[in-house]
Amino acid sequence: MARSIKKGPFADKHLTKKVEDANKGNKKSVIKTWSRRSTILPDFVGHTFAVHNGRKFVPVFVTENMVGHKLGEFAPTRTFHGHSAEKKAAAAPAPAKK
């Protein structure tokens, strides 16, 4: 279920404070955060966030298209290594029908 419009978007206060400080000083340093749940606000555009994915920090450069999404959407937590080639090879040669 989506968040109520009257509540507005959620962004951690410490994160918005860091962005405001960076905007005041015209600094474009990487902002490290564990807050995957924070919504990307228009003030965040042009900044790079290091978003924690459970193991390491993934750099996320925010563009205008990302506004309204969550920071965690751009830092995947699971790695897909592909299906085993052994199963593919066994399933591929299907018997020919006559």
UniProtKB/Swiss-Prot annotation:
NCBIfam families: rpsS_bact (TIGR01050). Residues 1-30, 78-98 are annotated as: Disordered. One of its GO terms (biological process) is translation. Pfam families: Ribosomal_S19 (PF00203). InterPro entries: Ribosomal_uS19, Ribosomal_uS19_bac-type, Ribosomal_uS19_CS, Ribosomal_uS19_SF. GO terms for cellular component: cytoplasm; small ribosomal subunit. This is Small ribosomal subunit protein uS19. Keywords: Ribonucleoprotein, Ribosomal protein, RNA-binding, rRNA-binding. Protein S19 forms a complex with S13 that binds strongly to the 16S ribosomal RNA. Residues 9-24 have a biased composition (Basic and acidic residues). Belongs to the universal ribosomal protein uS19 family. PROSITE patterns: RIBOSOMAL_S19. One of its GO terms (molecular function) is structural constituent of ribosome. It comes from the Bacteria.
